[in-house]
């Protein structure tokens, strides 16, 4: 049930239309179920103001991650991010792999960037409750203590 959208400025759109605008069409478009799901998702996003939730939850989460990073300077370079798109930067990919593996073991999914774990991403769903954010932080704290012992 694939669906996608493309938004751009007029300037970018004009470039995309050259030389053949049909290059940027879809082979899976027009599916009624996918379109209905997309409309429902847009309505939910607007009704629940998910962008505001993401901003507030990021303001809650990022300072707590920065505190953890300060407690483990031998592990972290820095924390960056905005809203619920958060990056944890490590001194080297091996440490990032250990942190990611420890989180996976504890049921927390994170993502590497490109082909290594020098930086790993925390990207929870926008509707995640604060209680689960706290669980992520607790599990990260346990993971960091475990990883520190291996350094």
Locate predicted features.
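Conserved N-terminal phosphate-binding loop of PLP-dependent enzymes in the Aspartate aminotransferase
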Residues: 1-151
